[in-house]
Amino acid sequence: MVSLSNQTRFSFHPNNLVVSEKRRLGISGVNFPRKIKLKITCFAAERPRQEKQKKKSQSQSTSDAEAGVDPVGFLTRLGIADRIFAQFLRERHKALKDLKDEIFKRHFDFRDFASGFELLGMHRHMEHRVDFMDWGPGSRYGAIIGDFNGWSPTENAAREGLFGHDDYGYWFIILEDKLREGEEPDELYFQQYNYVDDYDKGDSGVSAEEIFQKANDEYWEPGEDRFIKNRFEVPAKLYEQMFGPNSPQTLEELGDIPDAETRYKQWKEEHKDDPPSNLPPCDIIDKGQGKPYDIFNVVTSPEWTKKFYEKEPPIPYWLETRKGRKAWLQKYIPAVPHGSKYRLYFNTPDGPLERVPAWATYVQPEDEGKQAYAIHWEPSPEAAYKWKYSKPKVPESLRIYECHVGISGSEPKVSTFEEFTKKVLPHVKRAGYNAIQLIGVPEHKDYFTVGYRVTNFFAASSRYGTPDDFKRLVDEAHGLGLLVFLDIVHSYAAADQMVGLSLFDGSNDCYFHYGKRGHHKHWGTRMFKYGDLDVLHFLISNLNWWITEYQVDGYQFHSLASMIYTHNGFASFNNDLDDYCNQYVDRDALMYLILANEILHVQHPNIITIAEDATYYPGLCEPVSQGGLGFDYYVNLSASEMWVSLLDNVPDNEWSMSKIVSTLVANKEYADKMLSYAENHNQSISGGRSFAEILFGGVDNGSPGGKELLDRGISLHKMIRLITFTSGGRAYLNFMGNEFGHPERVEFPTQSNNFSFSLANRRWDLLESGVHHHLFSFDKELMDLDKSKGILSRGLPSIHHVNDANMVISFSRGPFLFIFNFHPSNSYEKYDVGVEEAGEYTMILNSDEVKYGGQGIVTEDHYLQRSISKRIDGQRNCLEVFLPSRTAQVYKLTRILRI
């Protein structure tokens, strides 16, 4: 018979039979003599507490060094010496390690911690039932109400005590399937069903007794099952050996019993002449001097251990008896049918509450004054969506097309996932982008919030379609080679109570901070309590959910400043590192971001995370091991703000080239990880205007001066996009419609506009001809430049010519040379621009071409330029180029001349 003496821990996940095993072996002292019999010494004495703590501290610092962990590593690398901020990073690192220890006290590993959706919410269990679980520590009673039980708060309630409510506030409710009329209950109490396949092994007709007999026959060797069949034989024999054949039968007769070591020595003395085969294979001596044994440090005979690992496990009887879907449907009526409506019922100290479950995956918002409800989404195997395509490989550079599904159609209505899949995805592919970023996908009560006041974090918005519709969107995008990113909002949540998380269980501090700290200073939204382990469990599981369930490829974390600082980012900064470690910094929020990035990148190595932080917190894109937050990219928010300021407030001839360059390449240390954009949804949606609306919105080409205004607008629109695209990092973003100069802003239906949809759409018809067709052609050429030439992945730009007087900027990136003339009137026949390599340079993009809406002033004889041996701009050679006003040119070194 085999013996298992390693400590084993099992973690069971719902709806599967995956068993996670963790073993720890700690041997204090072992001595193996040459003879067969082993003598093993087990030290169980406890060492003084101070010595243990000292040793633990030393081992932690040693393990950090061995793992290459340095809490201030990026400060050292950048040569930043700030004692206060460095101390803040060290303390944050220590607090993060303590947080991980707390996590491991309640969760098996990080995968378990990030997979709360496998347990929480509503799930079909294999044993013909539905399990529901949710968190409500402030409630005294929990139940599920829905159309399947007549909305009764007593029909399906949590059981009393720990069977229905644990110490952490989680409620567990079982909804048993109902036997059909004339059907008998299952013979086996553990009978399982396969809800996907029509038939399984249990439908073969083999009885449970036969399966158990087969399991025993295959597992036990002859004679090994003797003590299983006669379980009292061993203790009776031991009792007889210890106390003799006429052993006492009562405690009074037993008298005093010598200690274990004395009895063992007596027994050995009595059996000293026995053959070795009759003696135990090992001697265990307790040197703990009466102190408790260390149950975690257990040693076994190598022979026993080898035999255990060589032994094949018995056949899993629960799989052998599992029946298929047809048997289940024949015997049972589902407790919660597909499409059922339900809510969570709480009884609190202030009275009863009905809530949409926090982990609900499909939610219908309030309609016509009715309360919102969750929908149980469990389509049949035939109707459920089946994935067709694998995920695309992550490209070296990202060209992201930012979208909002609801306004993606040309009609004045809320568009759907299905319409977006059919109409917008092919356009994105044709336009040359390699990723889409979706905003407003998680469920939100109010459409006019653009999806930034999330109410149900695990549910795709039902106003766009079903969960399977969203799966189809992601799958078709992958089929076109497009990555799919979500604009995720974990920096705050909607303040709605009936459908959101606010006052979820009746208490004011369930998911959010209590009092003023729990409310955004300006937006009225609720602020998460990131220091709470259960809130972290919710948020990190939410990140893992969208990747696991919907196969998304990454996230842009929205408005990090709102969560990192208790003032929500609305404060003046002194450009001092003290701003990032003072009393207004939420260390718990920072640790959440670190933990989220660490877990996501381990669980999903190809995931992309993007940080949107207006304060550019130090270390955003540094590795977690070096004291950073672990993001892959950060958003350069300053560029779009600069362009809007120039267009609105500064005359064309007063634009500063130095300011443009310093803003576009603000942080050279992290320029490679910068995501740039000229305009995103903020310029079009958040009360602003798109560049096209500013530049030529309402301009009549036939009116006096109209053509000049239109030409100016077209030229600047192209130049702004070209210089932003080519001077940034390895990622670029554009909002839907701006690539062709959408002439109108976005305005969602609200009470102020009589709930009009007239501006909540996109004018795709403008692509066919005219100005918008020219602008689209130019933008497509930009994307093709990166697709075919790899512009964005060729290292950082080398900016060598910035002339504020002439309003000319020039820089190189690999073998490519970019030249911009922003002057509103001055053209230059032979403008000297420095180049390092002598040779021939061919123009590969000219913003003045007629097909891009230009004037066609630059003719073909200007397309090939030969360098002149003349030192300019710190370069050894130069080009003499023809630069019309408000034009841009891109050259490629096609032939190198060696002298």
From Swiss-Prot:
Belongs to the glycosyl hydrolase 13 family. GlgB subfamily. Catalyzes the formation of the alpha-1,6-glucosidic linkages in starch by scission of a 1,4-alpha-linked oligosaccharide from growing alpha-1,4-glucan chains and the subsequent attachment of the oligosaccharide to the alpha-1,6 position. Essential during embryogenesis. GO terms for molecular function: 1,4-alpha-glucan branching enzyme activity; cation binding. PANTHER family: 1,4-ALPHA-GLUCAN-BRANCHING ENZYME (PTHR43651), 1,4-ALPHA-GLUCAN-BRANCHING ENZYME 3, CHLOROPLASTIC_AMYLOPLASTIC (PTHR43651:SF4). The lineage of its organism: Eukaryota, Viridiplantae, Streptophyta, Embryophyta, Tracheophyta. This is 1,4-alpha-glucan-branching enzyme 3, chloroplastic/amyloplastic. It is found in: Plastid, Chloroplast stroma; Plastid, Amyloplast. Disruption phenotype: Embryolethal. Embryo developmental arrests at the heart stage associated with reduced cell divisions and abnormal cell differentiation, thereby leading to defects in setting up the shoot apical meristem, embryonic vascular tissues and cotyledons. Modified starch composition. This phenotype is enhanced when associated with SBE2.1 and SBE2.2 disruptions. InterPro entries: A-amylase/branching_C (IPR006048), Branching_enzy (IPR037439), Glyco_hydro_13_cat_dom (IPR006047), Glyco_hydro_b (IPR013780), Glycoside_hydrolase_SF (IPR017853), Ig-like_fold (IPR013783). It catalyses: Transfers a segment of a (1->4)-alpha-D-glucan chain to a primary hydroxy group in a similar glucan chain. Keywords: Amyloplast, Chloroplast, Glycosyltransferase, Plastid, Transferase, Transit peptide. Its EC number is 2.4.1.18. The active site is at E612. It comes from Arabidopsis thaliana (Mouse-ear cress). The keyword Chaperone does not apply. Monomer. The keyword Plastid applies. Changing E366K: In be1-3; reduced level of BE1 transcription and various developmental defects during post-germination growth such as shorter primary roots, delayed greening of cotyledons and leaf development, yellowish and small leaves leading to smaller plants with altered petals and sepals in flowers.
